[in-house]
């Protein structure tokens, strides 16, 4: 759950 949220945050910041 935490990893998934962090992954989404990272992807959003990268995008």
Swiss-Prot record:
Q: In which tissues is it expressed?
A: Skin.
| Entry annotated with the keyword Nucleotide-binding | no
Any one GO CC term of this protein is: extracellular region
Please give the biological process terms from Gene Ontology that the record holds: defense response to bacterium
Compartments where located: Secreted
Q: Which domain of life is it from?
A: Eukaryota
**Major site of localization recorded for this protein:** secreted
Keyword annotations from UniProtKB, A to Z: Antibiotic, Antimicrobial, Secreted
According to its UniProt entry, what is the function of this protein?
Has antibacterial activity against Gram-positive bacterium P.citreus.
- Name this polypeptide is given: Oncorhyncin-1
